[in-house]
Regions:
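PP2C/PPM-type serine/threonine phosphatase catalytic core
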Residues: 1-134
């Protein structure tokens, strides 16, 4: 969530480096090797990756409820391919630099992630919280 004064990360990063996720995975018979599930996947929750479902990978998300007040401008939904290469300040800067070109914002974010060397799957959705829909 972004406005001109603050950036707020409101989701839980479900990664194999998280102690709670490690414990959950190991209880389900999985192994963390080199901070990856079965040595393959850095995230601990995912759609797909069916070969790891019996090793502790689940698709159940953490859900966060957030009151959206009038001060918030944008909500960025992005994959770990974006977040592993760009931080909140990077995304905020890109967002407000491209405010007059909203339709291009997600493309610019994903291109910047690629420029920073991300080789993971990269996807991004930008939600304009100020736009009124009638």
């Amino acid at each position: 969530m972004f406005n001109r004064k603050k950036n707020e990360f409101i989701t839980t990063e479900d990664k194999c480096t998280d102690d709670k996720e490690k414990i959950r995975i190991e209880k389900l018979g999985g192994q963390i090797i080199d901070d990856r599930l079965d040595g393959k996947l850095a995230i601990s929750r995912s759609f797909g990756d069916y070969d790891l479902k019996n090793k502790g990978l689940i698709c159940e998300p953490h859900i966060t409820k957030k009151f959206i007040d009038n001060s918030l401008n944008y909500c960025i939904l992005a994959s770990d391919g974006v977040w592993d290469s760009l931080n909140l300040d990077d995304i905020s800067k890109i967002t407000f630099e491209n405010e007059n070109n909203f339709d291009n914002m997600a493309k610019v974010i994903t291109q910047k992630a690629m420029q920073r060397g991300s080789e993971d799957n990269i996807s991004c959705i930008v939600v304009d919280l100020k736009k009124k829909i009638y």
